[in-house]
């Protein structure tokens, strides 16, 4: 896929007609596109690429195709999502890092479920340096699923777990009550490409975890049992 528009630029039909033609002349085997922040802008390329930052943790994961592209007969690609909507440092507390991961889950699941998206790219792979008026006061944008040194954050496991080449299993919570408001652990998730995840406590089988609601993904996250459930199970085996 060749990008033939300046990133997030406004329409310029004369210029972009020419760039589209040149790309096709140089490589007839690949489709063309161009990253937009605009809905229903002039589509001269083969694929409408759109930065969909509509998900805020509560809203749907992705906008419907009919609300974004002017041509339903051409493919729609989500070229960016999340990123600045929920900056996350690797040293943020557990609930923040979990919500960061779940936002990527929700958007990817929505893109899969719709059947209308050719693909969905999260913004972005790595944290990156920026100027003094952007980022977190330290000239760093914490938009990545990995940090600047390529160390994975929890959200990286969301993407790793969708593949089948290597076994992946990452628990979203450290289960430390001091990382959670009022010491309440709440719901935790397991990001894995396993067919089943079984929970043991002190070598005693507790339960097989159920899959989460995001079933459009190739490998939906698993939902852990509650801390209360674990305590009750511990009491039964004391």
Language-model segment annotations:
Residues 207, 213-214:
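A short acidic/small-residue loop/turn micro-motif
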Residues 214-227:
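Aromatic sugar-binding surface patches on proteins
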Residues 172, 200, 225-227:
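A structural detector for beta-sheet-dominated domains
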Residues 187-208, 231:
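Beta-strand-rich binding/interaction modules
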Residues 1-151, 155, 162, 166-179, ...:
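Substrate-binding/catalytic cleft of secreted carbohydrate-active enzymes
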Residues 228-235:
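Conserved small/polar residues in nucleotide/adenosyl-binding loops
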């Amino acid at each position: 896929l060749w990008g033939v528009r300046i990133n997030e630029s406004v329409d310029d039909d004369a210029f972009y007609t020419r760039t589209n033609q040149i790309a096709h002349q140089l490589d007839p085997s690949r489709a063309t596109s161009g990253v937009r922040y605009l809905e229903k802008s002039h589509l001269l390329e083969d694929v409408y690429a759109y930065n969909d930052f509509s998900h805020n943790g509560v809203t749907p994961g992705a906008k419907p195709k009919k609300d974004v592209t002017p041509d339903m007969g051409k493919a729609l690609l989500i070229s960016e999502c999340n990123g600045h909507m929920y900056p996350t440092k690797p040293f943020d507390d557990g609930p923040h890092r979990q919500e960061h991961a779940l936002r990527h889950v929700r958007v990817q699941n929505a893109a899969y479920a719709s059947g209308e998206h050719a693909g969905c790219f999260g913004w972005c792979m790595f944290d990156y340096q920026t100027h003094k008026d952007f980022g977190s006061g330290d000239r760093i944008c914490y938009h990545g699923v990995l940090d600047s040194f390529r160390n994975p954050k929890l959200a990286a496991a969301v993407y790793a777990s969708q593949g089948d080449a290597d076994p992946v299993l990452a628990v979203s919570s450290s289960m430390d009550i001091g990382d959670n408001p009022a010491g309440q652990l709440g719901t935790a998730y397991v990001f894995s490409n396993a067919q089943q995840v079984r929970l043991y406590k002190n070598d005693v089988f507790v339960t097989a975890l159920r899959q989460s609601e995001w079933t459009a993904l190739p490998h939906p996250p698993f939902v852990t049992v509650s801390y209360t459930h674990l305590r009750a199970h511990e009491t039964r085996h004391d």
